[in-house]
Amino acid sequence: DPRGEHAVVSTGAWSTGSMAPLTFLENKDAGAVWAFQVEHNGAWRWEVGNNTVDGYFAVSGPTNINHAWTKKLDPNECFTTVPASFVLASTQQEAIANLTQYRRACRRVDSTTTQPRIIFNDYMNTINGDPTTEKLLPLISGAAEVGCEIFVVDCGWYDDSGDWWPSVGEWLPSKTRFPGSKGIVEVMDAIKDAGMIPGLWLEPEVIGVKSPVAQKLPDSAFFQRNGHRVVEQERYILDLRDGSARKHLDDVIDRLVNDYGIGYFKMDYNVSPGSGTDYQADSVGDGMLEHNRAYLDWIDGIHRRYPHVILENCSSGGMREDYAQTSRFQVQSTSDQQDYRLYPAIAATAPVMVAPEQAASWAYPQSSMNAEQTAFNINTTLLGRFFLSGYINRM
């Protein structure tokens, strides 16, 4: 940079979509290593450079130059920046250990829910978003037989049309996928009867453009720019600064926990709404920042109401693996990588970003694999939180 700086920037709502909000600086002469992390679930920037006095290092959340963020302060009004933290060590390995110690100490969730449990999820290289009672019951039996403690029904459980991407948002179970008088309760009861905790996939922050909820909620419940709702890949984005948006999601969580006994939610986030919303905000970046903070407060509210419930931060396979999120979620999905041969590199480096017991790296053995392939596959998930998929009922 002609101004003598090196900057790394992340834009939009995927805080780890391209780069990690984490860096290491090493002074070899002094034998010192500093590790810095930006603790924010949105846009951020860090830079290192020289000024007229000395070298410097700066970390920040959204900025004007990169993220269209400005904030007007009236006299005596205050603004709090996004948090950042740093550790000092003599080596990078020691710095990572210090970060892990810090992350464990500052976790915001009930410690009884952070103990690793073996998780089975029906998605990866298995049902792939097409669950039915007929498909799930054999997998439930197989998962229980191998000692799984949590069984998660992934995406598709709410879909009657076969085209669920633009219609999500009500989060009501399908009656065609789960027929009979009990519907999805038959599946949830089977999971509980097998001694496992039932879990469901949710993408709470989006409402499909074809969803009935899109017409029920006011425009204020959604991201807007220039007086119009933001549309991203046939989805509207909920703005959790709005009371009606938050009430909608609180009602969804309350219903799923109380009616179906859900004890685990996999929270996904598969679209990024660009720079933000200008509705009731000083700038689009300001609207994005305040929504991100409102989202974290909503997550905190789930923990207050249901301290026993376990939350997984998926966010499109690790696209929001920042400490603002991971301090509030017991489980962090590290990737959606489908090739078991490519996953070990991800699993081995995941503890740089999260506490090892949070890092959920997929293992998806299949009956067609030989012993070496199966062992290679399973070993990947042993590096963190045990996270299993595959047709184990056929093995």
Label for each model-derived stretch:
Residues D1-R103, R108:
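N-terminal accessory beta-strand-rich subdomains and adjacent acidic, glycine-rich linkers
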Residues H40, E77, M124, W157, ...:
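Short, flexible loop/turn elements at secondary-structure junctions
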Residues N41, F86, N125, E205, ...:
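Short, glycine-/Ser/Thr-/acidic-enriched flexible segments
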Residues V82, P198, L311:
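Hydrophobic anchor at the start of a short beta-strand
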Residues P83, Y123, V153-C155, M267-Y269, ...:
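Generic detector of well-ordered alpha-helical packing
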Residues T113-D251, Y264, G274, A281:
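Aromatic-lined carbohydrate-binding/catalytic grooves of carbohydrate-active enzymes
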Residues K175-G183, D193, Q215-A375, L383-R385, ...:
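Active-site neighborhood of glycoside hydrolase catalytic domains
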